[in-house]
Swiss-Prot record:
Gene name, Swiss-Prot/TrEMBL: DPP10
Entry's disease: Asthma: The most common chronic disease affecting children and young adults. It is a complex genetic disorder with a heterogeneous phenotype, largely attributed to the interactions among many genes and between these genes and the environment. It is characterized by recurrent attacks of paroxysmal dyspnea, with wheezing due to spasmodic contraction of the bronchi.
Extracellular side: 56-796
Name recorded for this polypeptide: Inactive dipeptidyl peptidase 10
Cytoplasmic side, ranges: 1-34
Intrachain S-S bonds: none
Source species: Homo sapiens (Human)
């Protein structure tokens, strides 16, 4: 732990001596006026020196209550952000996990709390995940949890009776000590579903025998109710590929067939005499994709499974399913997307007959975004709401709320737009039929923030910001979750200050209850020297693009500072936001007085489709140009040291950082890339094809987008490459190909390998990763003090 040394400044002012004039015989005559003036001047000089010392003394020496943020701090318990995992059980009850680990039920109307599970229960069963049954009688506890991909994990489970404390192991029939791919409660009573060996099992209640709903499951080939790698990472953004009807009587699920998909082998190097490999289906750009089918199974009475068919125009072509949602107890809405990702069709299917009708079709000249969005339906299904791109003059298209009215007899649809403007609707949260209001999150107040709004669906469409006045000094970035009947909502303040979770009444949002304040983290941060970020706006090609500078707390613009530029991990993401952030780069700012910059150029999200889709067929081109323009702007600032510039990126961010480092603009002294994508042909089909098309038709586009060409440009920079050998997202193959080309070009590099670690390293390796990155940038960016040659002493 770095300690701040205590420094004291001693200034000694001595009175001048009285000097007799030599050669004078007359008695000494004192010039009292002159002496007084001289003493006054000396006192003024002493005062000025003392004042300047105080002013120039760093803050940590004058304010002992604040200390610098260290890497060790990030791993302390009081620096952990607590997520209460709050969820609605019904319209008045919320279940959440308190900061001390108890699972509690809160009634929002009476403020009465009920302890459902003590924190010691987690210790007893070594459980790290929990889920409370809908009837609040049982808890599902997961232990021996092992992460598979980004969202998926395997675990063993026990069922715990809250009242009697009885415990049951959850196992498939005739199997003991099973490891399950998934387990969760249904929507009614004690319904249970779990997935074992890629097959779905169902229990009507905890005392009943398990019923196997599918039998086609085959490891790494046929997936039932659970996603394969491509669907989990790039399409559903979840490992869950099944959906309950509201009454719990039916289950919709995907069957993903990877039998023709090429497989990737991930070797495991440690822990055995001979390394073993994990083999799993991973379609790269242009390769065979998984095929997909959507089924609905009836859970009551004789088990009956029905397939829901794609639209006619998709039956003879490759497609994805990106969204499934129940509209009523028997109807589902499904979104089908072609492989090129520029045509999507929304259908509503009657699951008793299998009949599906097309409700809306979207097309794009580039690609379609927001394809996971779930439409919000009225109870009778006569209208639904979702966001669609709407043109806003020269600024291009922005996502806005549209209301779709279905004519019952003709099945024709009338569309009415409820919002408009140069801002984005992020998500539609709820529709209250009593008040005829729609609730949604938007960027209307600021593209960097998220506020909760309501809008009337009738008459003048009056729009109102619900969250704008809630803790406005602390919160400008929100998410929300409404209760089943929309009478109450959970409000999640996610920044810029320490996150807070609160409960509100929809009728009177100003009345609230704080569920989680993260007070421990708040107190810990108050003791640290953490500065506030500054926002600057850059004008590039008629776009206004945001640049964020995170400055040291004791920043002074007359000093010179090193700069670290951080890249985003995904296209369509957003780095410059009001979200709370504290990570390894916060330590670099504090400990090494480095300025950290983040810039959302073309290809970034939530600023309209025109900015986002500039990267179509130009991945690795316009983003590089914009980031370099941002750096050149920063170099005009007097406090940026042009000789101490650095860059960092992970995944796609590592790809952009590599493209910048090898460009003709030699701006950076060093750079670090973690798990960098180096060739889009080696990456996932759904990702690469979305932005660049099929390799067979776009060979030159893929060549231009590759890091592996002209790597001679990396000769002048100091580069650190970091990669886990078990990365299932960006395979180690990417770094291996890059290193091969660097060696051929005679480029020096530093490599940090994490054996058997994935795309996100485990907790046990995180400290080492962070310290490696920090040491690299600290060494690279430290101020070079030129030592003047010592002059030889002259002989007397």
């Amino acid at each position: 732990m770095n300690q701040t040394a205590s420094v004291s400044h001693h200034i000694k002012c001595q009175p001048s001596k009285t000097i007799k004039e030599l050669g004078s015989n007359s008695p000494p005559q004192r010039n009292w006026k002159g002496i007084a003036i001289a003493l006054l001047v000396i006192l003024v000089v002493c005062s000025l020196i003392t004042m300047s010392v105080i002013l120039l003394t760093p803050d940590e020496l004058t304010n002992s209550s604040e200390t610098r943020l260290s890497l060790e701090d990030l791993f302390r318990k009081d620096f952990v952000l607590h997520d209460p995992e709050a969820r609605w059980i019904n319209d008045t009850d919320v279940v959440y996990k308190s900061e001390n680990g108890h699972v509690i039920k809160l009634n929002i109307e009476t403020n009465a709390t009920t302890l459902l599970l003590e924190n010691t229960t987690f210790v007893t069963f070594k459980a790290s995940r929990h889920s409370v049954s809908p009837d609040l009688k049982y808890v599902l506890l997961a232990y021996d949890v092992k992460q598979i991909f980004h969202y998926s994990y395997t675990a063993s489970y026990v069922i715990y009776n809250i009242h009697t404390r009885e415990v049951w192991e959850l196992n498939p029939p005739e199997v003991e000590d099973s490891v399950l791919q998934y387990a969760a409660w249904g929507v009614q009573g004690q319904q249970l579903i779990y997935i074992f060996e890629n097959n779905i099992y169902y229990q009507p209640d905890i005392k009943s025998s398990s019923l196997r709903l599918t039998s086609s499951g085959k490891e790494e080939i046929i997936f039932n109710g659970i996603a394969d790698w491509l669907y989990e990472e790039e399409l559903l953004h979840s490992h869950i590929a099944h959906w309950w009807s509201p009454d719990g009587e039916r289950l919709a699920f995907l069957m993903i067939n990877d039998s023709l998909v090429p497989t990737m082998v991930i070797p495991r190097f440690t822990g055995a005499l001979y390394p073993k490999g994990k083999q799993y289906p991973y379609p790269k750009a242009g390769q065979v994709n998984p095929t997909i089918k959507l089924y609905v199974v009836n859970l009551y009475g004789p088990t009956h499974t029905l397939e829901l068919m794609p639209p006619d125009s998709f039956k003879s072509r490759e497609y994805y399913i990106t969204m499934v949602k129940w509209v009523s107890n028997t109807k589902t809405v499904v979104r089908w997307l072609n492989r090129a990702q520029n045509i999507s069709i929304l259908t509503v299917c009657e699951t008793t007959t299998g009949a599906c009708s097309k409700k809306y079709e979207m097309t794009s000249d580039t690609w379609l975004s927001q394809q996971n969005e779930e439409p919000v339906f009225s109870r009778d299904g006569s209208k639904f709401f979702m966001t669609v791109p709407v043109k806003q003059g020269g600024r291009g298209e922005f996502h806005h709320v549209a209301m779709f009215l279905i004519q019952s007899k003709s099945e024709q649809i009338t569309v009415r737009h409820l919002t408009s403007g140069n801002w984005e609707v992020i998500k539609i949260l709820a529709y209250d039929e009593t008040t005829q209001k729609i609730y949604f999150l938007s960027t209307e107040s600021s593209p960097r923030g998220r506020q909760l709004y309501s809008a009337s669906t009738e008459g003048l469409l009056n729009r109102q910001c619900i969250s704008c006045n809630f803790m406005k000094e602390q919160c400008t970035y929100f998410d929300a979750s409404f209760s089943p009947m929309n009478q109450h909502f959970l409000l999640f303040c996610e920044g810029p200050r320490v996150p807070v979770v609160s409960l509100h009444s929809t009728d009177n949002p100003a009345k609230y209850f704080i569920l989680e304040s993260n007070s421990m983290l708040k107190e810990a941060i108050l003791k640290k020297k953490i500065g506030k970020p500054e926002i600057k706006i850059l004008h590039i090609d008629d776009y206004e693009l945001p640049l964020q500078l995170s400055l040291p707390k004791d920043f002074m613009d007359r000093n010179q500072y090193a700069l670290l530029l951080i890249m985003d991990e995904e296209p369509g993401g957003q780095l410059v936001t009001d979200k709370f952030h504290i990570d390894w780069d916060s330590v670099l700012i504090d400990m090494d007085n480095v300025i950290v910059a983040r810039f959302d150029g073309r290809g970034s999200g939530f600023q309209g489709l025109k900015i986002l889709q500039e990267i179509h067929r130009r991945l690795g081109s316009v983003e590089v140009k914009d980031q370099i323009t941002a750096v050149k702007f920063l170099l005009k600032l007097p406090y940026i040291d042009s000789k101490r510039l650095s860059i960092f990126g992970k995944g796609y961010g590592g790809y952009i950082a590599s493209m910048i480092l090898k460009s003709d603009e030699k701006l950076f002294k060093c750079g670090s890339v973690v798990a960098p994508i180096t060739d889009l042909k080696l990456y996932a089909s759904a990702f690469s094809e979305r932005y660049l098309g099929m390799p067979s038709k776009e060979e030159s586009t893929y060549q231009a987008a590759s890091v592996l060409h002209n790597v001679h440009g990396l000769k002048e920079e100091n580069i650190l490459i970091i990669h886990g050998t078990a990365d299932t997202k960006v395979h180690f193959q990417h770094s291996a190909e890059l290193i091969k080309h660097l060696i051929k070009a005679g480029v020096n590099y530093t490599m940090q390998v994490y054996p058997d670690e994935g795309h996100n390293v485990s907790e046990k390796s995180k400290y080492h990763l962070y310290s490696t990155i920090l040491k690299f940038f600290s060494d690279c960016l430290k101020e070079e003090i030129s030592v003047l040659p010592q002059e030889p002493e002259e002989d007397e």
